[in-house]
Design a protein with these regions (language model features):
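Acidic helix-start/capping segments at beta-turn-to-alpha-helix junctions
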Residues: 88-112
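Histidine-anchored nucleotide/phosphate-binding helix
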Residues: 70-88
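N-terminal secretory signal peptides and thylakoid transit peptides that target proteins
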Residues: 1-16
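Solvent-exposed loop/turn segments at secondary-structure junctions
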Residues: 65-67, 101-106, 165, 170-175
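Loop/turn elements at helix/coil->beta-strand transitions in domains of secreted/extracellular proteins
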Residues: 55, 91-95, 160-164
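A charged helix-plus-loop insertion that forms the helical arch/lid used to bind
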Residues: 111-141
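C-terminal segment of N-terminal export signals and the immediately downstream linker at the start
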Residues: 23-55
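A cross-taxonomic marker for long C-terminal extensions/tails that follow the last structured domain
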Residues: 130-192
Length: 192
């Protein structure tokens, strides 16, 4: 047997040993992890989520106007699919849509949109496809907007089905300041 061939076989044997050790280690780690249960950090501010009825849980995090609309459509589809596929009622699911960052403004009611809608920056709002202008109502709360990312699913519809909303306080504070400045008011008054 030549030295080149012996050298190759020696390296091959060492490689197999290393691979076997690595494989055995990963199996041991996987076995150890399989026995433990993941526990997320708990905060008092999140206790309200444990009070929601429903064993099938889903959280959708929306950060843009389009993703907020998509979250409405997806949440509605989630409930429908659970009913059709598993015979579950809407009350069997606990679904939360989080409106944060640029999606936050879509958690605001029509009174806010009527007063401040034209001042909401384009990055946080969608022009009304019917008027081609800044909206003075929450487009996702109104019917007749089937071409938006919500595909016609509205906030009142998902609320009626038991969907819950969480709204980013940091973004709301930011927008209150921005809207107050644009309209010559005070951020605290806008925030209320």
């Amino acid at each position: 047997m030549s030295t080149d061939r012996r050298s190759f076989l020696t390296r091959l044997g060492a490689g197999v040993t290393v691979a076997g050790t690595a494989f055995g280690s990963s199996v041991s780690i996987a076995s150890a992890q399989a026995g433990s249960t993941f526990r997320p950090a708990r905060h008092a501010q999140d206790d309200w989520m444990d009070k929601l009825p429903g064993k099938h849980r889903l959280v959708l995090d929306a950060t843009t106007p389009a993703s907020f609309g998509a979250a409405l459509a997806y949440a509605n589809n989630f409930l429908t699919a659970n009913k059709d596929g598993y015979g579950l009622n809407d009350q069997d699911a606990a679904v939360i849509i989080i409106a944060r960052h640029f999606a936050t403004t879509y958690a605001y009611n029509d009174a806010m949109w009527a007063k401040y809608g034209r001042s909401i920056p384009p990055v946080a709002g969608i022009d009304d496809p019917k008027t081609k202008q800044r909206p003075t109502l929450n487009l996702y709360a109104a019917s007749g907007y089937n071409d938006l990312p919500s595909l016609g699913t509205t906030i009142p519809q998902v609320l009626q089905r038991g969907i819950h909303f969480a709204v980013c306080q940091m973004a709301t504070t930011f927008f209150a300041g921005m809207l107050a400045q644009a309209n010559g008011g005070k951020a605290d008054d806008v925030y209320k």
